[in-house]
Amino acid sequence: MKKITYGLILTALVSLPAQAEWVLNGDQSALSFVSTKAINVAEVHKFAELSGGVGADGMVRISIDLASVDTSIELRDERMREMLFNTAEYSTAEISAQVDAAELADLSAGQSVDMMVEGVLTLHGETRPLMMSVVVARSGDSNLLVMSKKPVVVNAPEFKLAEGVEALRAVAGLPSIGLAVPVSFVLAFDQG
């Protein structure tokens, strides 16, 4: 009887990691975007604070702290927080998606798989569908990396950000700021 009980406990413990959640490791993750001004001047920026995870059911939820925008110029960061993102009212952008949890669990350390992930992005009070071409790699027994295979293009007018972009353009005295913004990411998850 003891052998059966120990066997059941051992089976439950071995099964646990496959059912456990994946927690986003913000220190090992990066989300960057490219802005284009004056027609052909491109600059790379990032958000420093990301959080979220993947549930045992495959539900992905990522939160981007918009106040953590980092353009390497503090005045520009402040203007983006106030004039573009309006972080007093909209403090985060949220991404949610559903992935095949079994496919993630089946990956062995060192293996990777390409996925098309359909999700939604909520930004500035607007929610829009989002298609993401990603590579998912099992980097260790309890670590996953999810990387954009192609940039995701976010169009400012779809999220009612065009007026904010125009305000930034005017205050900076620029001839133009692009409304289509390529976004790339590397998300590191630790199994919890």
Question: How does the language model describe each region?
Answer:
Residues 7-15:
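Bacterial N-terminal signal peptides
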Residues 6-7, 81:
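Short amphipathic alpha-helical "recognition" segments used for binding
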Residues 20-192:
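Low-complexity, acidic/polar, glycine-enriched regions of mature
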Residues 1-4:
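Positively charged n-region of N-terminal signal peptides that target proteins for export
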